[in-house]
Amino acid sequence: MTGNIGRPGTGANSVTGQCNAMGSRLFANASGLLGGRDFLNAGHRAEVSRLLHIAPEKIPAKNSLAYDQILQGVADGKIKGLWVIATNTAHSWVDSARANGSLDQLEFLVVQDMYATTDTAQRAHLFLPAAGWGEKEGTFINSERRFGHIKKVSRAPGHAMSDFNSFRLIANYWGCGEVFSQWTSPQ
């Protein structure tokens, strides 16, 4: 718009309201497949399967729902349970009244967060305490789309654990732990 792209001290930055929102877009925790790939494209699914060491048949051949579609699914009674990870949907969603109404309709809400005091966590039927940034190893992507490495510098309090460990434990409990069998760290 101003003609300053590519000049020193300038650039296009994603201004978002959530921590690591850029990472969530790049690594597809919403409606797309890893790295901007498409669930509907067999070649993309094969590529992601190879990169992540996951059997191709474990990757869905249809798109998942975007955030607004998830909330609509809850409002329509099609979605009965939700697992919310590291975000406060009740407070930060564009239409918080709609988000709160949808969250209140759920039969089962799981919230995995480092704060049990958020509006969303207060509604949870099950709260999974999560480790904070200095209590786990990991990566993040900043608004300049640069990757950063987070080193663990202290132990998480109480029963809190890294998201990665929570995912692995729940996957094992659900009987699909083999999907994570080759993954030994979140990197």
Roles of regions detected by a PLM:
Residues M1-G11, V15-Q187:
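Non-catalytic alpha/beta scaffold blocks inside enzyme catalytic domains
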